[in-house]
Amino acid sequence: MHLSTRLGLERIKRAQAEGQKVWCETCPQYLLLTDKEMERLGPFAKIGPPLRPADGPDREALWQGSAQGFIANVASDHSPRVPAAKEPGRKNIFVDAQGKPIPFGAPSLETLVPLAWSEGVAKRGLPVTWMARVLAENPARTFGLWPRKGVIRPGADADLTIWDPTAEWTIQQAQHLGIAGFTPYEGWKVRGRAWMTLVRGQVMLNPAGELEQKPGYGRFLPRRGPTPPIAGAVA
């Protein structure tokens, strides 16, 4: 589920303290954005759960819950919609003039990792192990793909991102490849970006930004039962 409130986090903590197998995730939009985005973006900021008040306690609580290990994963909730589906909601974010529902969703995939590094590691001082935990190992554990995925060790697939921690750049929709035609992070200045990625030990994205593997390189991944995610504060 997309955890977005302090109250929800407190209930997760209570359930975990009682020994229940309850794991959760949150998303960059709930760590970084507020309901003020509705004034700027209107229907383009219509997501579920909704963005929370700017003067509320939720964002800081989620950051702390993630750093302390109560929130296992940070996921993109990538749900792009074409502009034509969102634009009719400018006057009413719920339905258009004909009563057709305005869809939920916003793009997040292309900004997930840069924002995690820039806002979590570079600005808040969280360790790199936090980023590896919430973006890689814990998701692999939760969805039954660990230890083949999500970890660097003998026998695992060599899925690696070689990261440039010093790169400084500005998020711009014009550089994105998705269908949404916008990003809620337009104009954000961030630090860090992928220099190269490898999938199963082979270069996927090279330093020139070119894909080196062809369609068909992907492989079916059979799932096993979930493995409890890593808990406790990151160090």
Language model region names:
Residues 219-235:
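Short, solvent-exposed cationic patches
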Residues 46-57, 100-107, 183-189:
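A short acidic, glycine-rich active-site loop
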Residues 1-74:
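Histidine/acidic residue-rich metal-binding segments in metalloenzymes
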Residues 25, 77, 116, 201:
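Residue-level signal for inorganic ion chemistry
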Residues 38-47, 87-100, 177-180:
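Short glycine/proline- and charge-enriched loop/turn segments
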Residues 73, 80-166:
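His/Asp/Glu-enriched, well-ordered alpha-helical/loop segment
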